[in-house]
Swiss-Prot record:
Organism listed in the record: Pan paniscus
Family annotation (Pfam families): Globin
Annotated function: The epsilon chain is a beta-type chain of early mammalian embryonic hemoglobin.
Record's keyword terms, sorted: Heme, Iron, Metal-binding, Oxygen transport, Phosphoprotein, Transport
Domain Globin: residue ranges: 3-147
GO biological process: hydrogen peroxide catabolic process
Protein's name according to its UniProt entry: Hemoglobin subunit epsilon
Residues annotated for heme b binding in this entry: H64, H93
CDD domains in UniProt: Hb-beta-like
Stretches of the chain forming a coiled coil according to its record: none
A GO CC term attached to the entry: hemoglobin complex
Tissue: Red blood cells.
Length: 147
C-alpha cells in the first residue's frame, strides 16, 4: 500500500480542485491516443481517430476522457485505499477489455504533462512528485486484477 503524507495529499487536492475535468479529460485521452497510437485499438467504436485534430475533436474521446478523469477524482478521494477503490475498473479492463496494464502508466504520464501545461509555475517539483506518486499508485491499482 502506498502512503501519502499530508503534504502530498494537499499538493494533489489543491491542484485537483482547480481542474476542469471535462476539458482536461478529453485532452489527456486525446494526447494518449496521439502520442501512443497503438492505444487506439482499444477505442475502435469511437469513430474517426485518423489524425490528431480528428482525435482531439472527437466527442467520444472527450466524453470518455471526462470519465477517465472523474475516476482520477475518485482516486484522490481514496488515496489511502486505492486497490479496493479501483477493483471493479481493474476487473473490467483486465477481463472484458483486455487492456495492456502498461497503458495505465502511459496515461499517468500523460496526466502529469496535462497538469504541467495547465498549471505552469504552480506545478512545482514537489507537486509533480506527489502527482507522480499518485498516478503510479493508480496504475498499480488498475493492474491489480492482472496479477
Amino acid at each position: 500500500m502506498v502512503h501519502f503524507t499530508a503534504e502530498e495529499k494537499a499538493a494533489v487536492t489543491s491542484l485537483w480542485s482547480k481542474m476542469n475535468v471535462e476539458e482536461a479529460g478529453g485532452e489527456a485521452l486525446g494526447r494518449l491516443l496521439i502520442v501512443y497510437p497503438w492505444t487506439q485499438r482499444f477505442f475502435d467504436s469511437f469513430g474517426n481517430l485518423s489524425s490528431p485534430s480528428a482525435i482531439l475533436g472527437n466527442p467520444k474521446v472527450k466524453a470518455h476522457g471526462k470519465k477517465v478523469l472523474t475516476s482520477f477524482g475518485d482516486a484522490i478521494k481514496n488515496m489511502d485505499n486505492l486497490k479496493p477503490a479501483f477493483a471493479k475498473l481493474s476487473e473490467l479492463h483486465c477481463d472484458k477489455l483486455h487492456v495492456d496494464p502498461e497503458n495505465f502508466k502511459l496515461l499517468g504520464n500523460v496526466m502529469v504533462i496535462i497538469l504541467a501545461t495547465h498549471f505552469g509555475k504552480e506545478f512545482t517539483p514537489e507537486v509533480q512528485a506527489a502527482w507522480q506518486k499518485l498516478v503510479s499508485a493508480v496504475a498499480i491499482a488498475l493492474a491489480h486484477k492482472y496479477h
